[in-house]
């Protein structure tokens, strides 16, 4: 293939050049994995997008990071799998059908077409031959196979359960999908309902999922901690309390003469001042049948949401019953029994005792209902007579006080002593205490009352009951002829689709109308990418080659949703026999967001495209372009359509090119932190693109005829040392995801190279050879981040192959011994940046390097240098 390059005399035109190189990559199928490849495997994957309509800058940053890793690893000699697909089921498509009268399938595939084109504009090194959408029949067919496999292994259950019901979306939500008591998509206040639901038995893997976190050394500690807390293993005691009635509850006491509480702090029993039961506890239900006020209280609690997250933020509320609980260590102490909104029935036993002195939730409750607060843990070094609990509970360590036989013990010692005493005491013929382990993790409810999801392959027969769809009858396809003229699930109104013969008895039966939670779709897609053409859900040979994913990239918001479900699915697939490994993702990187200033006027939010910003008297001012009216500059926040602080990637690519966008989103801050989008930052990246091209333009006539070689003496040797050090440090930065540091080093090295390239015609042959090697290194290192520019420059210098097909350069360890120094550069006494020069550089060499810096040049647009103060190996101050 003949590779043409730009006329070296022209300004670099990113749009034309980028399209050219993308076409060449596509034609040669550079990034497509074939079975003939036999090098070491490396699987890099970014969380695939929901096809909402257009990509945003968060997508750009996420996928650019993954692409840098993919291109770097490919150059390092790996066979790299870097696929792309679409997380395509979900409520937004149905909402669009309701609002715009567009079928969800049409809406989804139209959006995919647009977003695919946008992603291709970025020059991502993706294997598009493996592309699929989770709404493709071929994909959800295999997902239904997996459901049947899980069903056969006993990992699927159908049971009536209280569920989180979103009254707007009219569907069930998992606990993780309820945020502050509201639906994560609709924002509606979640209600509690009892429905027959399908569950995946993720709780069977609680211990294994917890233990597996210790092996995930390449995961952020924060994510591992979040999952550990969500799984929520605790070691505690089941404590049985005798019940007494004050009045009106004698019948309840006959049926329930005791209540069992679960506690991780039996050491604090002498500080207990109340018991609290869940609104769903059998005792609560029995009392409510005879007490209308209690019944109303329970209904009110349910309307506020009953998830852990909702209850943590809700005001603590209780209803005092006529029951009293007898203290297990002192029968003369009787504690009031409350029905409380903060106790969950599905954790522990649905009953707790409250120790207000040493627990914030209990203190809040006791403070509201004027209950006693008795401290039983004394901080070390404190005086028991003076110690009181005032505004906040004491939750630290210490020694036990006011606790009878536990006094003087540490809380840990008191736990054991209390447990032993309770295990030896009897109540109604059984020990009053029993050690147990509890997990917070609950089974995953996957039933959703909506159309646009994977149909659950189940048939309901009046004679045979619940019957799985035979594997040979799959897929159960979604019907296209549905209506969206009202909320709810259209499948429930589609009698023709529902009607089916029972595969066991042949009688008329009905299909399951619930579809699967969309998190099921994303829980195994990474495995399907290894062989998306396989007839079974996965190809075992491909799985063995590629899994686990070496590097997974996505947002930390998925720590206890997608990431935990994917870990469960991997274990379930191992149990079925599809895979041999436990974990889906060996390495995980969670990137920060792209954020932007917000702007407002009297009419509301204003977009960045509608304003101009000037600096006046040291302050930035914003005005509307249309009428020059003043606009208030607000906080820097996550880009969102609602606040209009979004920047369309298409517009930026059209103006500056994809390489500029890729370079900027990685250059401005560490990748795990948020990056602030600024027009000046993008313009700076664009200037760098043009500067690189100018350097190539000036040097190409000479360098294209030069064979690269390491310098052996003088300035040529110093340049080679700098080039090899750059190669070593940038390689280390890329391995550590320190993309911003790598970019900073590339800026610095161009500052070293540029003055020499400007006088290329007059330098000695040894320097020319050293410069050619340095330029080759430089282009190889910018290629993962700015692939189009690197290809164009490589071709301009006479390259006969694609730079993306070249191996990563190798540095000489003998040349990376540190003999450079980095000097802070001040302008009028204020630090503006740094310059790296040889430790032995003369003042003239330092001055030349400083004058070549972009930020120095920017300050010289309207001003001139009065003097430059250089303290060798210390500092440079430019006085304007």
From Swiss-Prot:
It comes from Bartonella quintana (strain Toulouse). This is Leucine--tRNA ligase. The gene is leuS. GO terms for molecular function: aminoacyl-tRNA deacylase activity; ATP binding; leucine-tRNA ligase activity. The lineage of its organism: Bacteria, Pseudomonadati, Pseudomonadota, Alphaproteobacteria, Hyphomicrobiales. Belongs to the class-I aminoacyl-tRNA synthetase family. A motif ('KMSKS' region) lies at residues 638-642. It holds the Pfam family tRNA-synt_1_2. It catalyses: tRNA(Leu) + L-leucine + ATP = L-leucyl-tRNA(Leu) + AMP + diphosphate. PANTHER family: LEUCINE--TRNA LIGASE, MITOCHONDRIAL, LEUCYL-TRNA SYNTHETASE.
């Amino acid at each position: 293939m003949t590779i043409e390059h730009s006329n070296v005399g022209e300004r670099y035109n990113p749009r034309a050049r980028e399209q050219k190189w993308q076409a060449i990559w596509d034609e040669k199928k550079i990034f497509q994995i074939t079975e003939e490849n036999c090098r070491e495997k490396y699987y890099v994957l970014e969380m695939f997008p929901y096809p909402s309509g257009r990509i945003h800058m968060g997508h750009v940053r996420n996928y650019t990071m993954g692409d840098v890793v993919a291109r770097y690893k490919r150059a390092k000699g790996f066979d790299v799998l870097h696929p792309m697909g679409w997380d395509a089921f979900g409520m937004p498509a149905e909402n669009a059908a309701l609002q715009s009268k567009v079928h969800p399938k049409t809406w989804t595939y139209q959006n995919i077409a647009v977003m695919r084109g946008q992603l291709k504009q970025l020059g991502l090194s993706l294997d598009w031959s493996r592309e699929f959408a989770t709404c493709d029949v071929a994909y959800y067919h295999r997902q239904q196979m997996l459901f049947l496999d899980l069903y056969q292994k006993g990992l699927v259950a159908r049971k009536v359960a209280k569920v989180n019901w979103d009254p707007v979306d009219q569907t069930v939500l998992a606990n993780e999908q309820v945020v502050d008591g509201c639906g994560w998509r609709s924002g509606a206040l979640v209600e509690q309902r009892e429905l027959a639901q399908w569950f995946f038995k993720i709780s069977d893997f609680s211990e294994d999922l917890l233990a597996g976190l210790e092996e995930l050394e390449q995961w952020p500690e924060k994510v591992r901690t979040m999952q550990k807390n969500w799984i929520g293993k605790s070691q505690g005691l089941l404590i049985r309390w005798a019940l007494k009635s004050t009045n009106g509850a004698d019948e309840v006491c006959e049926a329930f003469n005791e209540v069992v509480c679960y506690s991780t702090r039996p050491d604090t029993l002498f500080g207990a001042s109340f018991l609290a039961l869940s609104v769903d506890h059998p005792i609560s239900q029995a009392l409510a049948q005879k007490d209308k006020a209690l019944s109303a209280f329970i209904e009110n609690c349910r309307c506020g949401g009953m998830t852990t997250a909702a209850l943590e933020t809700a005001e603590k509320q209780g209803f005092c019953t006529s029951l009293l609980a007898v203290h297990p260590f002192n029968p003369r102490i009787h504690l009031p029994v409350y029905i409380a909104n903060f106790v969950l029935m599905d954790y522990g036993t649905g009953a707790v005792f409250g120790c207000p002195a040493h627990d914030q939730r209990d203190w809040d409750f006791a403070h509201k209902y004027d209950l006693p607060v008795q401290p039983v843990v004394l901080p070390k070094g404190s005086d028991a007579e003076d110690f009181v609990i005032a505004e906040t509970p004491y939750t630290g360590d210490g020694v036990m006080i006011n606790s009878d036989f536990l006094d003087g013990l540490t809380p840990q010692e008191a736990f054991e002593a209390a447990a032993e005493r309770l295990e030896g005491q009897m109540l109604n013929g059984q020990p009053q205490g029993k050690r147990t382990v509890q997990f917070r993790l609950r089974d995953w409810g996957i039933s959703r009352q909506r159309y646009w999801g994977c149909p659950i392959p189940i048939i309901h027969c009046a004679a045979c009951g619940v019957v799985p769809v035979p594997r040979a009858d799959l897929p159960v396809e979604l019907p296209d002829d549905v209506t969206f003229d009202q909320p709810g699930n259209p499948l429930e109104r589609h009698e023709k689709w529902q009607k089916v013969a029972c595969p066991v008895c042949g009688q008329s039966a009905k299909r399951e109308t619930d579809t699967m939670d969309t998190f099921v779709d994303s829980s195994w897609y990474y495995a399907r990418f290894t062989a998306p053409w396989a007839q079974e859900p996965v190809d075992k040979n491909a799985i063995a080659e590629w899994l686990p994913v070496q590097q997974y990239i996505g947002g930390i918001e998925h720590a206890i949703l997608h990431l935990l479900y994917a870990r469960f699915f991997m274990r379930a697939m191992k149990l079925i026999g599809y895979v041999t490994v436990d974990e889906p993702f060996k390495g995980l990187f969670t990137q920060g967001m792209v954020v932007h200033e917000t702007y407002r006027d009297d009419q509301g939010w204003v977009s960045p495209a509608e304003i101009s910003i000037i600096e006046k008297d040291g302050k930035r001012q914003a005005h509307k372009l249309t009428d020059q009216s003043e606009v208030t500059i607000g906080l820097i926040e996550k880009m969102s359509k609602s606040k209009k602080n979004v920047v369309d990637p298409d517009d930026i690519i059209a103006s500056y090119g994809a390489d500029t966008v890729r370079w900027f989103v990685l250059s401005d801050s560490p990748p795990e932190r948020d990056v602030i989008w600024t027009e000046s930052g993008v313009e700076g990246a664009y200037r760098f693109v043009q500067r690189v091209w100018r350097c190539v333009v000036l040097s190409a006539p000479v360098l294209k005829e030069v064979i690269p070689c390491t310098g052996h003496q003088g300035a040529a040797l110093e340049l080679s040392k700098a080039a090899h050090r750059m190669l070593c440090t940038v390689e280390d930065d890329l391995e550590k995801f320190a993309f911003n540091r790598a970019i900073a080093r590339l800026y610095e090295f161009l500052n070293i190279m540029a003055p020499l390239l400007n006088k290329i015609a007059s330098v000695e042959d040894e320097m020319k050879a050293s410069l050619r090697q340095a330029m080759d290194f430089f282009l190889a290192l910018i290629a993962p981040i700015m692939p189009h520019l690197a290809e164009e420059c490589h071709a301009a210098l006479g390259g006969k192959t694609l730079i993306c097909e070249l191996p990563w350069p190798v540095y000489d360890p003998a040349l990376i011994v540190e003999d450079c120094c980095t000097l802070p550069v001040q302008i009028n006494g204020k630090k503006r940046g740094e310059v790296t020069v040889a430790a032995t550089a003369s003042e003239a060499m330092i001055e030349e390097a400083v004058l070549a810096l972009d930020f120095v040049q920017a300050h010289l647009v309207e001003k001139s240098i009065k003097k430059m103060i250089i303290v060798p190996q210390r500092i440079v101050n430019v006085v304007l």
